[in-house]
From Swiss-Prot:
NCBIfam families associated with the record: rpmD_bact
Protein family: Belongs to the universal ribosomal protein uL30 family.
GO biological process: translation
GO cellular component, one term: cytosolic large ribosomal subunit
MF term (GO), any: structural constituent of ribosome
Protein name as catalogued: Large ribosomal subunit protein uL30
Pfam families associated with the record: Ribosomal_L30 (PF00327)
Keyword Ribosomal protein: yes
Keyword line: Ribonucleoprotein, Ribosomal protein
Length: 60
């Protein structure tokens, strides 16, 4: 199954609370943090919520 590499590229100051919680749920705490998650619809939805704060790459 494919995986997604998600990296936080912007900080959380001044963003909405639900976006802040979504970053925490993904496991991102600070700028530059990287996590690898399974490519599932739930994860895609979370990434879509914070798409302006993260970069996403598909990895094998």
């Amino acid at each position: 199954m494919a995986q997604l590499k998600v990296q936080q590229k912007k900080g959380v100051v001044g963003i909405k609370a639900n976006q802040r919680e979504t970053l925490r749920t993904l496991g991102l705490k600070r700028i530059g943090d990287v996590v690898v998650k399974e490519d599932r619809p739930e994860i895609r939805g979370m990434v879509n919520t914070v798409r302006h704060l993260v970069t996403v790459e598909e990895v094998e």
